Amino acid sequence: MEMRNVKGTKDYLPEEQVLRNKIKRACEDTFERYGCKPLETPTLNMYELMSYKYGGGDEILKEIYTLQDQGKRDLALRYDLTIPFAKVVAMNPNIRLPFKRYEIGKVFRDGPIKQGRFREFIQCDVDIVGVESVMAEAELMSMAFELFQTLNLEVTIQYNNRKLLNGILQAIHIPTELTSDVILSLDKIEKIGIDGVRKDVLERGISEEMADTICNTVLSCLQLSIADFEEAFNNPLVADGVNELQQLQQYLIALGINENTIFNPFLARGLTMYTGTVYEIFLKDGSITSSIGSGGRYDNIIGAFRGDNMNYPTVGISFGLDVIYTALSQKETVSSTADVFIIPLGTELQCLQIAQQLRSTTSLKIELELAGRKLKRALNYANKENIPYVLIIGEEEICTETVMLRNMKEGSEVKVPLSSLSNYL
């Protein structure tokens, strides 16, 4: 049998997983500093839930992994963490609002594979339910900047409002049944350009006259400020969108992050669930062209799941761990899983005890030579693993309660008392 991975999946060896764990910890620490509570939801869901009309829309349905259990029930692997979160809130009406949760977990999409994009991947999500104010969006955007600052990645956030975009299409008389198709085309404008948008809408069955209207509208809007849209399009949805965008902009200025954000009137976030603010996060250096995070406001899903059709104001943000890992792996050197490597020279029993003592009395990560390698080979291993310090312990060191401390970076050695070892590290 040929040993190979399923297309779109990957094994992460220890030197890779160390960096991935660092990203997870940075996410968890940042999320918790913003008052978010952890949540875990099942990977396996009812197909009916994952294909719900308020979810990802027709485009996502093509990418869902489906299966049946032994009871012939139709199931699906989750394609995001948003719909499972909405399900949890709908099933638990006693959850106190506002509710801020985070979840880090695997999701699955049978879609195209490219740099930093796989079919099995990890999303790191934060969602807030119970807040109508766009202050929630501003806080999530601020949190994103803080996270990427922690990871030493410079980013910009593009943002828009679906009310503005829907209102523009309404004002130029795009039929309601075609709105979703046009939005999906406009969402690609930065990748395919205005000519590509025209071709895309034509392929979706939109008339040439309507395609010309759409493209001319796009070109006329590119230089407009947020305030200009209300005058350019006499439409109540446009007015609502402008109002929310102006409020958001005020919060971004107050937080000192407005200069790192860009208003993009045709950013759509293709998913049909969004009802207000939408945003996408990009690396400033452009080393990865796709977004490394995204999100927005979706006020209808939880009410639809509960069956009361009430608005439950909800906004979220999602970070792609795999694409962040790809960005960081191009910049960071491999870090070690251990701070100290202990090499016994005929003192295995005592070194086992010393390793245990150091683990229990310090925060150091300790690795003990277990394979019985000679000193030269053991030092070579520590060097290749980027372990910064090695303790060499023979009979003499045991008798004098000392250790030979080797600094692997400098290549220097010094004998130090075991009791004060931490002072030398």
Curated annotation (Swiss-Prot):
Primary subcellular site in the record, as a coarse category: cytoplasm
Top EC class for this record: ligase
One Pfam family it belongs to: tRNA-synt_His
Gene3D superfamilies (alphabetical): Anticodon-binding domain, Bira Bifunctional Protein, Domain 2
EC number of this enzyme: 6.1.1.21
GO molecular-function term, one example from the UniProt record: catalytic activity, acting on a protein
Subcellular location per the Swiss-Prot or TrEMBL entry: Cytoplasm
Source organism of the structure: Bacillus thuringiensis subsp. konkukian (strain 97-27)
Claim: Calcium is one of the keywords in the record: no
Family: Belongs to the class-II aminoacyl-tRNA synthetase family.
Entry's Gene Ontology cellular component terms: cytoplasm
Record-given protein name: Histidine--tRNA ligase 1
Assigned keywords, A-Z: Aminoacyl-tRNA synthetase, ATP-binding, Cytoplasm, Ligase, Nucleotide-binding, Protein biosynthesis
Transmembrane segments annotated in the record for this chain: none
InterPro entries (alphabetical): aa-tRNA-synth_II (IPR006195), aa-tRNA-synth_II/BPL/LPL (IPR045864), Anticodon-bd (IPR004154), Anticodon-bd_dom_sf (IPR036621), His-tRNA-ligase (IPR015807), HisRS-like_core (IPR041715), HisRS/HisZ (IPR004516), HisRS_anticodon (IPR033656)
NCBIfam families assigned: hisS (TIGR00442), PRK12420.1 (NF009085)
One GO-annotated biological process of the protein: histidyl-tRNA aminoacylation
Subunit and partners: Homodimer.
